[in-house]
Amino acid sequence: MVYFRAHQPRHTPKTFPLEVHHSFSDKHPQIAKAMRITGIALAALSLLAVVACVIAVSAGGAAIPLAVISGIAVMSGLLSAATIICSAKKALAQRKQKQLEESLPLDNATEHVSYLTSDTSYFNQWESLGALNKQLSQIDLTIQAPEKKLLKEVLGSRYDSINHSIEEISDRFTKMLSLLRLREHFYRGEERYAPYLSPPLLNKNRLLTQITSNMIRMLPKSGGVFSLKANTLSHASRTLYTVLKVALSLGVLAGVAALIIFLPPSLPFIAVIGVSSLALGMASFLMIRGIKYLLEHSPLNRKQLAKDIQKTIGPDVLASMVHYQHQLLSHLHETLLDEAITARWSEPFFIEHANLKAKIEDLTKQYDILNAAFNKSLQQDEALRSQLEKRAYLFPIPNNDENAKTKESQLLDSENDSNSEFQEIINKGLEAANKRRADAKSKFYTEDETSDKIFSIWKPTKNLALEDLWRVHEACNEEQQALLLEDYMSYKTSECQAALQKVSQELKAAQKSFAVLEKHALDRSYESSVATMDLARANQETHRLLNILSELQQLAQYLLDNH
């Protein structure tokens, strides 16, 4: 997972500026360190000297030499304290910049790519990209009014064309961030078509992780014109500032010396000297800061700073960096835009494909359930039919034709039967049975061989003794009668059959539509794979252009340092 510390400073070109003029401590860090140690030692000695002066005056010792020593000690302490404060401030800024460099993603985004490769779940994948996009959005690729004025002085007649490219860079970067934020929304359809573990989508996210990580790691340190700070001192202004700072320091020393000479040597006046020295030191410090601020924001300093940049870096290096930055962001923006268009165009097909696939799965489950219920109901009908046949077959069979004829006449003359349809079926069955018996007796059997028992059962569907069914009529309901005599299905079986036919028709229609949609979805999947190859090319191009920009930034700083 990609985590960033809370309240982490922004990675932006302004954090890694082009230093137009390095100070003495930057050029000679070892000497500056020795001076800081000396200042700390002087501050400690000055405090000891002041304490010694107070004790000596209280004891009635030599006041004037001790007062002079105390004044010098106080002044040395003040200067040492000011030096320590400035050094600590600069050391803190350098430490902050080092922390920023350490917090940048590793080369080629190894940790993020490894994470995505080992854990490809949906939420973690998008959370990782979201964290990287949030960090990328902190890069500020805009130029404020003072820097624009400085660039206008540096570039001269080329300013208008280069400024147009700079504005396009800012606009492309903003649009690119917007597309990155909307990617998850664009890929809702493809995620449903090939959920989460799909190689094309995983590869695209992995490539985009590499691109964003490289941008976060290298773009802030390859800012070019975005790394320039207008409110810095030019060479001439820095010289003037140094002269004024030394003059004010000497003035404070002279003031403290005057106080020591003209004030009487007593304990209260030593306190006055100390307070006055402190006040003069604070006033000197504030005046120095005010002079520096005025010099940094003066038009004269801006013109001199522009001349210094023209002499050292020159407009060609800055223009080249603008060109490569424009090429980098234009290529990334166009690649992401093409990817978004492809994903948005394919989204309805993928969503419809996923919905239809889910519908087919649901209909298949319904079909299996209904088919099982239908077969079970058929088995129950067959068991009931066999049971009813056995019940009808158990009734006594008539011994002669006269009894049969009597029984037939009784059945034919029965007008009070509650089930006329059943009676009609019985009558038809009896007629068919008599006809069959007559034909069978005349062709195959003699009267002696005729057995009433053999020809007493009519078999329309099963072994039914229809001549005796009238006796069990009262024991069968309508559904059982139909089941027994007409090979009819029960009401439950009929319902299952109707539902099964309906689901079968819906399933066939869905499968037919799915076969057509599958081709379109495969075409869209191919286009998505093409977008993956485009992102791979964009990743290589991004790495190449960022390396070029980094080398140009180092060249610009080298030219500034060796001026």
Swiss-Prot record:
GO terms for cellular component: extracellular region; host cell membrane; pathogen-containing vacuole lumen; pathogen-containing vacuole membrane. Residues 58, 274 are vacuolar. Keywords: Host membrane, Membrane, Secreted, Transmembrane, Transmembrane helix, Virulence. Interacts with host CCDC146. In host cells infected with C.trachomatis incM, CCDC146 is recruited to the periphery of the pathogen-containing vacuole but recruitment is not dependent on incM. It comes from the Bacteria. The chain crosses the membrane at residues 37-57, 59-79, 253-273, 275-295. Residues 1-36, 80-252, 296-563 are cytoplasmic. It is a multi-pass membrane protein. Belongs to the chlamydial CPn_0065/CT_288/TC_0561 family. Interferes with host cell cytokinesis, centrosome positioning and Golgi distribution, and contributes to the morphology and stability of the pathogen-containing vacuole. May exert its effects by acting directly or indirectly on host microtubules. The keyword Transmembrane helix applies. It is found in: Host vacuole, Host pathogen-containing vacuole, Host pathogen-containing vacuole membrane; Host vacuole, Host pathogen-containing vacuole, Host pathogen-containing vacuole lumen; Secreted. This is Inclusion membrane protein M. It comes from Chlamydia trachomatis serovar D (strain ATCC VR-885 / DSM 19411 / UW-3/Cx).
